[in-house]
Swiss-Prot record:
Residues 1-82, 161-188, 200-266, 317-348, 387-416, 461-497, 514-534, 556-720, 736-780 are annotated as: Disordered. Keywords: Cytoplasm. May negatively regulate the snf1 kinase. This is Protein sip5. Residues 1-30, 224-233, 461-471, 482-497 have a biased composition (Polar residues). It is found in: Cytoplasm. GO terms for cellular component: cytoplasm. Belongs to the SIP5 family. InterPro entries: Sip5/DA2. Residues 200-223, 388-404, 635-647, 668-677, 691-704, 751-767 have a biased composition (Low complexity). Its main location: cytoplasm.
Length: 815
């Protein structure tokens, strides 16, 4: 095959040579007639140099790659061609076997129920089927009915369409078998030979060979009948010895049993063999096809199983032991030590289990039908009477063989070592070899890995030992010159790790001068034997050191990058939280603005005067100090005049304890007017926010003008920014409203409100004044509310004269 491949590849190489150098050869054709030859020889020599071809420098490297690809494709094509040829041959053999061979109406080849690879031993399976120890491959029926007639059963068994019950197709018509005559019986008896059990196997093989139907059977006129010396039974000793030593191939053929094809008889007890077999069909519980009742039976639970399903069951592939799994063949070891050695780190392949009861060592038994058809072995003495008629054969077999199948199941299970049991290992005898090959392969891989680890360990050990020796006594030549023993070198080799590391660094830094000193001082000594190995180890260590430094730098860079990323994430998170807080503050500002309009409704509706007064006074007594702020109505000039350069900024604890408040810009008088107009136009009942104000937090910050910066609040300084609490509006008509006066006048009570605020801890409220009604607006000076306890919120009270008349239908408020 190699020569043919070389011959096939030569034309392509020469043609590519000509194509590749056509321009050069044509250009130099007129110069020298030998130019082409020298050029071809030079290219051939360059391409054939092994030192250049390994680097891919040769001129024919491209051609070599193309040749390898072509060769690889040819190998694949040859493999595909071989597989296709085997498949075609297998199909032909299957068709021939189904056409010419059968065993009691069954076949010796599979019927295509499973399309996977057939990895069972076909020769062993064939032998077991011919010996009637394993059921043949019956043809399975997809459907079956007990009411089918004989020709319907025949059509189903032959794979033909099932005809109607009252119609018999021409191909299914048959005639009853003719009765056997006396002449036929006499001729049959002449072909039979009574088996003699006292003969040896060699004589039995000769007798079986003479009775094989493939050879000419002896006739009454044959030499065997006449008894002459030319008969095979009367040949000389020389002929016998010559026949024994003549052919090795012939001896191998004679060693096996001979198959005999019984006379073709398509009837059993007057019925067609298909009708006799399939009239009591049984379903296989695995493939769900209907077969004759003569199926295999499991040895453990006596369940039926067809042969096609049986040959698919096998041992698992070799694998490491799992969950205490033991090796089955280890039980046959001679001693416990051998069994333990076989279990240590070895692959196992447990026996196949029964698909029904999951008992290991799966095996089947088979009870053949009470007749014989097809192939038999000539050496089987019990099959000699089968040459007779079907009726006589069935009667004789009933006495020679076990009784036929009965409806009663077997009561006990059979052992896996029973002679009648066929296990899955029997039809796959190479399972032990496969397991041994897998174990050897695993052992080779383990040995290779162990060798690699050992080599690496020895290299590291030798390198450390060399470094320690270099640190203590210098080079190996110096050690030999000074007469240092091997024991001392071994003791130096096994130093402490710190000493070895120091020796390693010292030797790396002073390797040049030390080498020069050793060469100068020991010029008459032999060169060190492991210098090249030491250099390789040094190079390897340098590479490892550089790799370690690179990995360290990379890890540091990665850590720094992660820290930067975390810092960016934290900054984004804080920015997002600040935006959320600002947004929430704006929402609370709008909410408190609505609350101010609802609180001002109290003054515009006289019907809610007393009730609001009483409820607000009661609420004001229970609340903490500093929660009430009145609406700012001071002119912008006054506010700006009293404001200090550092405006008020409310601390966080004060913001958490302060009620809902709203701060209006000092210069926005239009906004205050709008708020008052809304309070007059919407006379709705107000809830005074005595509940919601206690649960709400700081309302909103001041939308201050650019010239009013915010600053930290100083407790000792006077308040400069007006703060408002709309609960104090309800306190305008406070507890003093319970009197009998018809008209109350509130004005100029800043000092009293200051005293009340500091004493009771509630918001400053306006007290009642003497009876004269207010005629105008009298602004009062701004007073700072003194803090009481933990009330840090500064408050300003600007009182306005408010006249409330019970008798008047409307409340008159002068602003």
């Amino acid at each position: 095959m190699g020569n043919s491949q070389t011959k096939e590849s030569r034309p392509s190489l020469s043609s590519s040579n000509r194509r590749g150098h056509q321009w050069g050869s044509s250009s130099s054709h007129g110069r020298s007639p030998y130019g082409d030859r020298h050029h071809a020889e030079g290219s051939r020599s360059r391409g054939s140099r092994p030192d250049l071809s390994m680097f891919g420098i040769g001129g024919s490297s491209d051609r070599d790659v193309a040749t390898l690809e072509h060769r690889r494709e040819t190998k694949q094509e040859r493999e595909a061609r071989r597989l296709e040829k085997e498949r075609v041959a297998r199909l032909k053999e299957r068709e021939r076997s189904m056409r010419e061979e059968h065993v009691d109406g069954g076949y010796l080849v599979t019927q295509g129920v499973y399309v996977g690879t057939e990895d069972f031993n076909k020769a062993v399976t064939r032998q077991l089927m011919i010996e009637r120890r394993l059921a043949p491959f019956w043809r399975g029926l997809n459907d079956f009915s007990d009411s089918w007639t004989e020709h319907q059963l025949m059509a189903a068994a032959r794979g033909l369409p099932i005809p109607p019950p009252d119609e018999i197709p021409p191909e299914l018509e048959y005639k009853n078998p003719p009765r056997s005559t006396e002449e036929a019986k006499e001729s049959t008896i002449q072909h039979l030979m009574v088996p003699i059990t006292s003969r040896s196997q060699s004589y039995g093989s000769e007798a079986s060979q003479s009775s094989t139907p493939t050879h000419s059977l002896p006739s009454p006129t044959s030499p065997f009948a006449s008894g002459t010396s030319s008969s095979p039974l009367f040949r000389t000793r020389a002929k016998t010895l010559a026949s024994l030593t003549s052919s090795r191939h012939g001896s191998q053929v004679d060693a096996g049993p001979k198959e005999i094809q019984l006379p073709k008889d398509p009837f059993v007890n007057g019925q067609p063999i298909e009708a006799y077999l399939y009239k009591d069909a049984t379903e296989c519980p695995i493939c769900f096809l209907y077969y004759p009742p003569y199926l295999n039976r499991t040895r453990c639970c006596d369940q039926p199983i067809c042969s096609e399903c049986f040959v698919q069951i096998k041992r698992p592939d070799p694998h490491p032991p799992e969950h205490g799994e033991t090796d089955s063949n280890a039980a046959n070891s001679t001693s416990d030590r051998d069994r333990q050695e076989s279990q240590d780190g070895q692959l196992v392949s447990g026996p196949a289990a029964c698909p029904f009861c999951v008992q290991p060592e799966f095996g089947v038994t088979y009870a053949p039908p009470p007749f014989r058809r097809g192939l038999v072995y000539a050496t089987d003495s019990s099959l000699r009477p089968t040459f007779a008629s079907p009726v006589s054969s069935s009667s004789s077999l009933s006495s020679a063989n076990p009784p036929a199948i009965t409806g009663r199941r077997r009561a006990t299970s059979l052992s896996a070592n029973d002679p009648t049991v066929i296990t899955t290992d029997r039809i796959r005898p190479d399972w032990a070899q496969k397991l041994a090959n897998a174990r050897a392969h695993a052992a080779r891989r383990s040995a290779a890995a162990t060798a690699l680890h050992t080599a690496a360990y020895l290299m590291n050990t030798n390198s450390s030992g060399n470094e320690s020796r270099n640190f203590s006594l210098g080079r190996r030549g110096v050690m030999r010159r000074t007469g240092t023993s091997e024991n001392q070198s071994v003791s130096n080799r096994s130093g402490s790790p710190a000493l070895q590391a120091l020796a390693f660094l010292t030797d790396r830094r002073a390797v040049g001068p030390e080498t020069d000193f050793a060469e100068e001082g020991g010029g008459n000594m032999a060169p060190p034997r492991n210098s090249s190995r030491r250099n390789r180890i040094d190079d390897l260590e340098e590479m490892m050191m550089m790799e370690a430094i690179r990995l360290s730098l990379a890890s540091e860079e990665e850590r720094r990058r992660k820290e930067e990323k975390e810092a960016k994430k934290e900054a984004k998170r804080r920015e997002k939280e600040s935006k959320k807080a600002e947004k929430a503050a704006r929402k609370l500002g709008v909410y408190s603005n609505n609350a101010s309009s609802s609180a001002l409704d109290v003054l515009s509706d006289p019907r809610h005067g007393k009730g609001s007064s009483s409820s607000s006074s009661m609420t004001g007594e229970d609340t903490a100090c500093g929660k009430g702020k009145e609406v700012e109505r001071m002119p912008p000039s006054t506010t700006n005049a009293t404001a200090s350069p550092s405006s008020l900024e409310i601390p966080s604890d004060a913001a958490n304890s302060s009620p809902v408040a709203h701060v209006i810009e000092p210069g926005s008088s239009a906004q205050a007017a709008t708020t008052q107009s809304l309070a007059r136009e919407l006379p709705k009942p107000s809830h005074l926010r005595h509940v919601s104000s206690a649960s709400s937090s700081f309302s909103s910050l001041v939308d201050s003008t650019p010239d009013d910066p915010t600053g930290a609040y100083d407790g000792s300084a006077t308040a400069t920014e007006p703060m408002f609490n709309f609960r104090s509006l309800a306190a305008v008509i406070g507890d003093e409203d319970k009197g009998v006066e018809s008209t109350e006048h509130v004005e100029d009570t800043s000092s009293r409100a200051t005293v009340a605020s500091s004493a009771s801890g509630v918001a400053p409220s306006a007290t009642e004044t003497s009876g004269a009604p207010a005629t105008g607006v009298e602004p009062v000076s701004v007073e700072t509310i003194t803090e009481n306890g933990d009330c840090l919120m500064p408050k300003e009270l600007e009182t306005r004269s408010v006249e409330i008349t019970h008798t008047a239908p409307n409340t008159e408020a002068t602003s």
